[in-house]
Amino acid sequence: MFTGLVEEMGKVVNISKKATGLGITIKGDKVVEKVKIGDSIAVNGVCLTVTKFSENTFTADVMYETIERSGLKRITAGETVNLEKSLTLTTFLGGHLVMGDVDSEAEIISIVPKGIAKLYKFQLEEKHRQNLKYVVEKGRVTIDGASLTVIDTDDASGIFSVSLIPHTLENITLGKKKVGDYVNIETDLFGKYVEKILKFNNAETEKKEKSGITMDFLQKNGF
């Protein structure tokens, strides 16, 4: 689990194809300090497990499911990526709870200067636009591993926007991207849980109503 606060930008130094997916080696400084085999590091918002490390690099495997859902399918050697080590019980939670499980990609469709800030608009892939129901105005969304505040949404077209100040743009990879580029998106974890619970409760209620055993029935019969 992560906070969505990018610790540093690292650089991809090597990519190798494997039978199970990809092997990726990334250069970093902060995230490699005290790292151990088996530790989790978010790479552009994708939770990867460290399989090997050196003084300033770490290596991880990427499975096909992850490759298909994320921008790691387009990643190249020399590319800059956002990095964050997994949180601990003493980690300052300055962003929001991020799982490192990317839902889909989104395309940058516009970048407009707004005073000192820049307004970015994103459009979810059509087959994943149902995920916009978990993106709410003034809520949080994870973009390439960075926890950002949502300005507004357009559910019909799968579009949402965020506004970024210069400091943020200088410290995450989004500041280097342009219109037409794609980013990894992870939507709100709690929204997914609430939806699942409500669906389950509704299904259970329907079953009880069909059987004739409802809360009213139980109360009337002394239960």
Tell me the role of every PLM-derived stretch:
Residues 1-223:
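Conserved loop->alpha-helix
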